[in-house]
Amino acid sequence: MIKSASFKDGLELNLALMKAVQENNRGLIELFIEWGADINFGLITVNTENIRSLCRELGAKEALNKWELLNVFYTVKRFKSSNNIILCHELLSNNPLFLSENNVQLRRIINYKLKNLSINFILDEISFSEKLTRFWYALAVEYNFTEAIQYFYQKYKHFKDWRLICGVAYNTFDLHEIYNKEKTDIDINQMMELACTYRYNYPNIYYCFMMGADINRAMITSVIKSYIYNLFFCIDLGADAFEECLEIAEQTNNFALVKILSFKNYYSPDSSLLSLKTTDPEKINDLLDDETYESKNLLIYEGTDYY
């Protein structure tokens, strides 16, 4: 295991211990404990009485409570690599300890992550095991771990459009690859609405715009979500649904948005964005880096006497 490509690519030490316990590898269990792994993590995957006895000898508890299980989840997912995400899925997504309905907080975390992404299925109608699988798949796309993406893509083709949906939310590069690879039942405007439900998601908003999505619908979604920076980006791209957006802002008593939208006569499209006309994700991400990109119309608004 230590000499394997997966270990060299990077595994969280406690996750490696869990794998060694699953494989009943006494030598590796003792080695990983010597290196500093927590023997209690082994209780997640122990499957023989001999290894359970070894875990006890090494100081393990009899069982983990729901908060300790939550700590296991947070600890092993913190390490970012393709193989770490794949192994997290393989060890946890069908693990009875993690599927227990007593793990209320874990279920809330997973449901929160998947809530915006569940645009072509009903979240409450799928099993928690599937939710966990979709969660790890989404992380692979979010961090652009190509090996993990291919692993999930090949193994879970029945998750209709899931890779595309995650790309819209997190990853312009993978969105571009999968959107041009296969047909989708998801309308480009639906993709744009999803993109606008994530703050500072400029590259994916721009990509959907270049693919023909309605920028006014994007502007409306940004107002509904109260995402001011996305709103200004939509205005930069030529959105002009000010009356409808102003009505929404007034109905929700969002006075900050009312003030922004009231300056509609000051705003105009940003020609530098509109002239690029590309779907090349590298060019888009270079242009719209969230640390360097500044909205032309946001700067105009900040320059008014009423800001």
UniProtKB/Swiss-Prot annotation:
Reported function: Plays a role in virus cell tropism, and may be required for efficient virus replication in macrophages.
Family: Belongs to the asfivirus MGF 360 family.
Record's protein name: Protein MGF 360-21R
Example GO biological process: taxis
Source species, domain of life: Viruses
A Pfam family annotated for this UniProt entry: ASFV_360
